[in-house]
Design a protein with these regions (language model features):
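N-terminal topogenic module of multi-pass integral membrane proteins
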Residues: 1-123, 230-283
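Generic multipass alpha-helical transmembrane bundles of integral membrane proteins
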Residues: 111-112, 117-241
Length: 283
């Protein structure tokens, strides 16, 4: 197939210029959230080192929840603040999330929705597949499977990158090196309730994505509603399949992501109620 006949060629050339990373952003953990969480743990009788570790993890949960919320609903920033606040409550009551898992999810979402305004590049791919390998090696084999699935889906949606098919195959190959000997794990009802709440509140976001006005950070172009909806669907698929297969440990790891989904859903609901009341008062 000639280059001019390749349906992927325009996307490949317009989004491949410069750098080896297209999805990452710096995150600052040295803020008030860390200090507050550290103080809370110290008051609970923990030593300084344990308290600081807890504080950093709590701050990470807040920031990753906020960042993931921006990928789920890039039009309504305050939903991320709500999700971040809920993630702190979850960290204090249920324990901290897993930063590696949250980072993996963040990159998967950004690859699918392209809110960065750039496709995934070699550095992003190495990072994603390495995390999938690492988690698979620890017995969580579903992560490389989901990584491969995400790559294949990305190759088929608007502006898809044809090499994603090969990367998907590589991710599936990594599954062969995963530890599949771990037995099935139980899932506590508290996580089932959180998953159900996230699903109910987040579902309207998929419809609202059709009218998104968000623009990519790098190219300044309106992001594809289809890609955003695919990313939202992937979020639900990942958020529910991983805990069902791998149990409480991975449910706790993904709790900040659920809080992000709940946060954007709550803000969308409040926004809709306010608009309905405003329209009613105008009549």
């Amino acid at each position: 197939m000639g280059k001019k006949d390749n349906k992927y060629s325009n996307a490949a050339t317009s989004l491949s210029e410069g750098g080896i990373f297209g999805l990452g952003r710096p995150i600052d953990f040295t803020d008030g959230i860390t200090r507050i969480a550290t103080f809370w743990k110290t008051m609970g009788g923990a030593d300084t080192e344990t308290a600081m570790y807890f504080g950093l993890n709590t701050a990470a949960a807040f920031f990753f929840s906020w960042l993931i919320a921006q990928e789920l609903d890039p039009d309504r920033k305050l939903g991320g603040i709500i999700g971040g606040g809920l993630s702190i409550v979850a960290a204090l009551t249920l324990g901290e999330g897993n930063v590696l898992v949250l980072l993996w999810l963040l990159f998967i979402l950004r690859m699918l929705n392209r809110t960065s305004g750039s496709r995934h590049k070699i550095g992003d791919n190495v990072f994603l597949i390495f995390i999938a390998y690492w988690l698979g090696k620890d017995g969580y084999w579903l992560y490389p499977v989901l990584t491969g699935t995400a790559y294949i889906i990305e190759s088929q949606i608007r502006g898809g990158y044809y090499r994603s098919l090969y990367l998907g195959g590589l991710a599936f190959a990594v599954t062969a090196m995963a530890d599949t000997s771990m037995k099935a794990h139980s899932l506590s009802m508290i996580y089932v309730y959180l998953m159900a709440l996230c699903f109910i509140l987040f579902l309207p976001e998929i419809r609202m994505a059709a009218v998104t006005e968000a623009k990519g950070d790098i190219d300044g172009k309106r992001i594809s509603p289809q890609r955003l909806q695919v990313a939202q669907g992937a979020f639900l698929m990942i958020g529910f399949s991983v805990p069902w297969v791998h149990g409480d440990a991975q449910a706790a790891a993904l709790t900040p992501a659920w809080m992000a989904g709940i946060g954007v859903g709550v803000f969308l609901l409040v926004d809709a109620i306010q608009k309905a009341m405003f329209e009613k008062n105008k009549q």
